[in-house]
Amino acid sequence: MSGILKRKFEEVDGSSPCSSVRESDDEVSSSESADSGDSVNPSTSSHFTPSSILKREKRLRTKNVHFSCVTVYYFTRRQGFTSVPSQGGSTLGMSSRHNSVRQYTLGEFAREQERLHREMLREHLREEKLNSLKLKMTKNGTVESEEASTLTLDDISDDDIDLDNTEVDEYFFLQPLPTKKRRALLRASGVKKIDVEEKHELRAIRLSREDCGCDCRVFCDPDTCTCSLAGIKCQVDRMSFPCGCTKEGCSNTAGRIEFNPIRVRTHFLHTIMKLELEKNREQQIPTLNGCHSEISAHSSSMGPVAHSVEYSIADSFEIETEPQAAVLHLQSAEELDCQGEEEEEEEDGSSFCSGVTDSSTQSLAPSESDEEEEEEEEEEEEEDDDDDKGDGFVEGLGTHAEVVPLPSVLCYSDGTAVHESHAKNASFYANSSTLYYQIDSHIPGTPNQISENYSERDTVKNGTLSLVPYTMTPEQFVDYARQAEEAYGASHYPAANPSVIVCCSSSENDSGVPCNSLYPEHRSNHPQVEFHSYLKGPSQEGFVSALNGDSHISEHPAENSLSLAEKSILHEECIKSPVVETVPV
C-alpha cells in the first residue's frame, strides 16, 4: 500500500531540486531555518511551553526536519468542473501537468508572497477608486455620463490610492472572484471555448442545496419524511429550519440533530474568558512589584488615620456603668460647621456616636435677634398643628439666624452616662430655657400617681439664673387613662431605673412649640397622650404634644382647659414647692 501512495518522482522534471536527496541536514543555515514556522531548534525544544492555554499539551520531542528552500510548481488555468461558485459558471481549475518550476529560499519566498499580495491589493484599491469615481459622476447611477463609461483601470494612478496605510489580513487575498473575472482569466490562459453546460449544472446544484431538510411540521412520519427516506438525520439549526419537526414529534428512524446556541455561546464566553485571563496574567507579572509597594504605602498611610479616629472617640466620651437609660440627643445642622469650638464638639460627638450616651442634655439657647423669626415660625406651627402633629421636631431655638429642623436620635446604652462635674457644661445651662423632667422611680401600673418634683429654669435679663420649682399633682392630669398605663408599662420603662427625658420649650413671650416624639419607633403601638399647656399657652386652644405627639383626648377640650385663675393658683403652688434640681451658673 505504501508503494502505491509513494509519489513517483520520475514523472517530475529531473532538474527539480526536490527529486534529489540532501546529503546532510546540517547544510541548512540557522537564518533560513529560523524563517520557517515548522522548524524547531532541538536545544530549546526540551523546554518548550505552549504559548496559549487554549492549546493542548503536546508531546515534547525533537524534530529532525529542517526546510532550506521552497519549490513552486506553476500550472496553467483550465475550466475546472470541480467547484460550485456562488453564482454563474466558468469554474477555475488547472491542467494536469505543471509548466514551470521555481525554487526560492525561505526569505525569498516570503518577499515574493509580499510582492504578490501588494499587487493584488493595488488592483483591488484601483478598482474601488474607479467604482467610486463612476458613482460620483453618475450621482449614484441616477445620471448617465459618457466620461464615466470611458474610465478604465489605467486612468487610476498609484498616487490616487494609499497602499501603505491599508491593513488587510491573509484572508483578504482568498476572496472569491466574480464570473467576469473568471472568464477573463480562462481566456488569458489559452482556453478558447468555455463549456456553457456547466452553468446550468451549477444552477441546479445550488437550487438543490437551497432546499434542505424535510417539509414536516411538528411531527415527522417515517414513511413520508424526506430525511428518513434518504437515511439522514433531521437537522434543526433554528426554529423550523431547515427541518420543521420538534424534539418530541420527530419520528425519523435515523435520528435528529438540533443546534444548541446556548452551548455554542457558553463555549465562546469560556474561550474569551481564558484569553482575557491569560492576557491579565501577562500584564500583572511586570507590574507585580509596583503594586506591592503601592499597597504597602497605602496601608501605612491609612494606619495612623484609623488610630486617630479611635483615639478621638475614646477621649471624647466618658462611659460609666449605670442602670439602663434612654437619652435623646438633639443637634442642629449648623453645628456641624462649628466643630472648632469645644462646646459644639461635645454636641456633635453625642449625635454622631449614638451608641455612647452623654448625660449632659444638650440644649439650644434662643437668640434675642431671632425672636421675631421664632414667633412667626411658631405661629405657623400652631396653624398646622392639627395636620402635621408628630411628623418631625422643628427646633425654633437656633444658635444662628437661620432656623433648621433638628433630627432626633434615641440611644439605648447599658448605663446612664453622667459627667463628673456640672460646671463643665455650665455654658449650656446658662443660655437655655429647657425643661428637665427627672423621673426617679417610674413604677408600672401607677401612672396616675405622679408625685415627683419638677423644676423649671428661666434666665433673668441681668444674666443670673433663677430656679422656679413647682410640683405636679395627680389632679393636673385628668385624662391620663388606663390605656396610657398599659402603653408605658415595664416593657418600655423598667422599674427602679431612672431615665432622662429632654423637652424643648420656648421663651416666656413665645407660644408653645410642639416637641417631637421621644420614641418614634413605638408611635404606632402606644396611645396618643396630649397635655394642655397651662403655663405657656396664651389661649385655651394651644396644645403641647406630650411624649407621642397627637392625642385622642383632644375630643374633650373642656376637660383639659384651665382658666386663667387656675393658672395663677398653680403658679403659686409651684413657687411654694421645694427645689429639686440645682444647676450651677
Curated annotation (Swiss-Prot):
This is Cysteine/serine-rich nuclear protein 3. It holds the Pfam family CSRNP_N. Belongs to the AXUD1 family. Keywords: Activator, Apoptosis, DNA-binding, Nucleus, Transcription, Transcription regulation. Residues 41-52, 351-366 have a biased composition (Polar residues). It comes from Homo sapiens (Human). Residues 30-40 have a biased composition (Low complexity). Residues 335-349, 368-389 have a biased composition (Acidic residues). GO terms for molecular function: DNA-binding transcription activator activity, RNA polymerase II-specific; DNA-binding transcription factor activity; DNA-binding transcription factor activity, RNA polymerase II-specific; sequence-specific DNA binding. Binds to the consensus sequence 5'-AGAGTG-3' and has transcriptional activator activity. Plays a role in apoptosis. Its main location: nucleus. It comes from the Eukaryota. It is found in: Nucleus. One of its GO terms (cellular component) is chromatin. One of its GO terms (biological process) is apoptotic process. The keyword Ribosomal protein does not apply. Residues 1-52, 335-395 are annotated as: Disordered.
